[in-house]
Design a protein with these regions (language model features):
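Short secondary-structure boundary/capping segments within folded domains
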Residues: 1, 25-26, 44-45
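Transmembrane beta-strand segments of Gram-negative outer membrane beta-barrel proteins
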Residues: 1-12
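Surface-exposed strand-loop-strand hairpins of Gram-negative outer-membrane beta-barrel proteins
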Residues: 10-27, 242-244
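Outer-membrane beta-barrel porins/channels
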Residues: 32, 37-423
């Protein structure tokens, strides 16, 4: 026997931000599965009746998604957050000038307790700027003079993300029929992983220009009489790729305990999937801010070797256990129930030498055991018409206090979390 199937996958998302509605809609064709089974009859009398050999391909995960959101900012801007990061880190004029002028500041001045990568990129592109009124010794009531680095007010923003890829699984199977009562099977699975994510965040900025004889510059903070003017903007592009391969083994049995009954019990165990993966990241911050004479661009790959932007590691998923039961009634109704459990806190993260990674502590602390319950029924109403209904409940993989701990040189801020859900 041989089979294959195609599908059309439609991705549609909608967003609302400060009164602005946005929608993304895209349809892609996909080869979801194909396979064949060769059956060898052994005997009608012996315990072993049939041996089946199979090969299958299916796309176990499809990552294709689109999302966009944007609207009016009313003065809010990420640039103020980035200037706040620098100020909170205790930046001074010397460090500001060194970061601005250094050929590669991301190694010399960066550490987790000082300046973030993204805030330094913002400094070098004018997304934040030194406050000319700053006075470290000032003790008066003008708070602006106490702030070393300033941001810009925002007018509008736009966020867009596109995800591509999937997990393709290639299965090599063998199964045995023992007396038409017990069915045993084993499957070797080989996985091909590819996930690409591109996200882009843009802000249009506002500046303030003097209407008197003061000068013609554009300032971050207005004084009385200044007028708001368009001040250009900036775009932060983030690139992320995950690729690799994996292997696992699945063992299962279906048992018919009663010879004259269609009732059956299923048991299966899946070994961990052992993955070897590579993550690659990059970020580009481009600005064209009217307060400055020229546009600027910072591309991390121009400063950092692949050693900093590429990460190789091994991941092993948890053991997975499954029990199921099903039967038919009168040849018209089929009933089934299934329970599955996997403890994701037992997942393992190692480097290519087999040593445990530092993130392993977070895996054990923030991941849960996941229980999945599925029940379903199908009723044949007419020879060519059936009704099917089902219920699926999955508990949350992440604990409530889990957070996204990005790699050092990741500047993306989007976060995905699978909560408890029913379908």
């Amino acid at each position: 026997d041989a089979s294959f199937s195609f599908s059309l996958n439609n991705t549609s998302t909608q967003s609302s931000f400060n009164g602005t509605q946005m929608k993304e809609d895209k349809t892609r064709a996909s080869l979801d599965q194909m396979g064949f089974v060769y059956t060898q009859k052994v005997s009608n009398r012996n315990l072993l009746r049939y041996v089946n050999f199979g090969f299958g391909y299916h796309k176990s995960k499809n990552f294709n998604r689109l999302f966009s959101m944007g609207g009016v900012l009313d003065g809010l801007s990420q640039s103020w957050q980035l200037s706040g990061d620098l100020n909170d880190a205790g930046i001074n004029g010397t460090d500001f000038d060194n970061i601005l002028d250094d050929k590669n500041p991301y190694g010399a001045y960066f550490n987790r307790e000082k300046y973030s990568i993204l805030s330094m990129m913002a400094l070098r592109t004018g997304v934040v700027d030194w406050n000319p009124e700053y006075d470290a010794e000032y003790k008066g009531e003008d708070n602006i003079r106490k702030i070393p680095v300033l941001g810009w007010d925002g007018e509008r923003n736009n966020f867009y993300s596109e995800e591509k890829g999937g997990i393709s699984e290639y299965d090599f199977s063998i199964a045995f029929n023992l007396g038409d009562r017990v069915y045993l099977g084993a499957t070797l699975g080989i996985y091909d992983v590819l996930y690409d994510r591109f996200s882009s965040y843009t802000e249009d900025l506002i500046g303030y220009q003097a209407t008197d004889e003061r000068d013609n510059r554009i300032y971050s903070i207005p004084v009385e009489g200044d007028q708001a003017v368009s001040n250009g903007g900036y775009t932060l592009d983030n690139y992320y790729r995950l690729e690799g391969s994996g292997v696992d083994l699945k063992l299962g049995a279906i048992i018919r305990p009663f010879e004259e009954s269609p009732f059956r019990i299923g048991l299966s165990v899946h070994t961990p999937t052992w993955y070897e993966l590579t993550e690659t990241t990059n970020a580009v911050l481009s600005s064209d801010i009217m307060a400055f004479e020229a546009p600027y661009q910072e591309n991390l790959s121009n400063y950092l070797t692949p050693l900093y932007l590429t990460y190789d590691y091994r991941l092993s998923t948890p053991w997975k256990f499954n029990v199921s039961a099903g039967t038919t009634i009168g040849g018209l109704i089929a009933l089934g129930a299934e329970y599955e459990y996997a403890d994701y806190s037992t997942s393992r993260l190692e480097d290519l030498e087999g040593f445990q990674l530092g993130d392993q502590i977070s895996v054990e602390k923030f991941l849960n055991g996941v229980s999945t319950l599925r029940v379903g029924m199908e009723a044949r109403i007419a020879p060519s018409f059936s009704l099917r209904a089902g219920y699926n409940h999955s508990s949350a993989m992440f604990k409530d206090d889990a957070y996204s701990a990005l790699a050092v040189y990741r500047t993306s801020t989007d976060f995905n979390n699978v909560k408890e859900k029913d379908t």
